[in-house]
């Protein structure tokens, strides 16, 4: 049962992070197309947002390992 719980936790976190990253990147590209003069500022903000979104699956993997090995 622990294997199933760990797999579900990691899988849902990976799915949610990939969906969130896709939305952030698509909206950033859309904004860059509308206002090219802000592309540098938008790009740096996008990288910060993607980094924060990627923290969730990393924490989920840690929780999955705790579920598996405890």
Curated annotation (Swiss-Prot):
Gene3D superfamilies, per database record: F1F0 ATP synthase subunit C
Domain of life: Bacteria
PROSITE patterns documented for this protein: ATPASE_C
Cysteines engaged in disulfide bonds, as pairs: none
Stated family: Belongs to the ATPase C chain family.
GO cellular component: plasma membrane; proton-transporting ATP synthase complex; proton-transporting two-sector ATPase complex, proton-transporting domain
Primary role: F(1)F(0) ATP synthase produces ATP from ADP in the presence of a proton or sodium gradient. F-type ATPases consist of two structural domains, F(1) containing the extramembraneous catalytic core and F(0) containing the membrane proton channel, linked together by a central stalk and a peripheral stalk. During catalysis, ATP synthesis in the catalytic domain of F(1) is coupled via a rotary mechanism of the central stalk subunits to proton translocation.
Regions that span the bilayer: 1-21, 47-67
Membrane topology term: Multi-pass membrane protein
GO-annotated molecular function: lipid binding; proton-transporting ATP synthase activity, rotational mechanism
Ion transport as UniProt keyword: yes
Name this protein carries in UniProt: ATP synthase subunit c
Subcellular location, principal: membrane
Organism the protein comes from: Latilactobacillus sakei subsp. sakei (strain 23K) (Lactobacillus sakei subsp. sakei)
Subunit-level organization: F-type ATPases have 2 components, F(1) - the catalytic core - and F(0) - the membrane proton channel. F(1) has five subunits: alpha(3), beta(3), gamma(1), delta(1), epsilon(1). F(0) has three main subunits: a(1), b(2) and c(10-14). The alpha and beta chains form an alternating ring which encloses part of the gamma chain. F(1) is attached to F(0) by a central stalk formed by the gamma and epsilon chains, while a peripheral stalk is formed by the delta and b chains.
Subcellular location: Cell membrane
